[in-house]
């Protein structure tokens, strides 16, 4: 499957309307092939990798083996979620995660990249992958800050280490020409 087809398939599987009403077991489950998290990390890897790290990066996840890291996560009999959410149960934790996903997706669609930058429910890699998938080809599929900094510096951006991620994305897209044809090539 080429990247264009994969991109469209993701949007077919997870349109914004579906995301707004997504249930926890659609977000994360042990039948990995149909969950949002599986698509985000594995199925769409050709649209930029977010591999590595633990499942914590998704905010809440269904586990096979109960995590043993009480300083970072809270868990019940099926799910684990970040302690920093101060959620008393899985439903509260998922509400926080889902709100963040919707905010990121809506902000990406409207071009409000500053709002994505400010969102802190997820780490940068996860939130910018979500943003890329909903941004109508206005972002590059590069999610790691250091990679964006290197690319921007190489193309003449001064002091890329102090720039916001959305500023680096804007700059890099402008260097590609910013046309819809150039954006399609980014896929």
Model feature map: region roles:
Residues 1-124, 135-187:
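An N-terminal alpha-helical hairpin/helix-loop-helix interaction module that forms a charged
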Residues 127-133:
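Short hydrophobic alpha-helical segments that form membrane-spanning helices or hydrophobic packing faces
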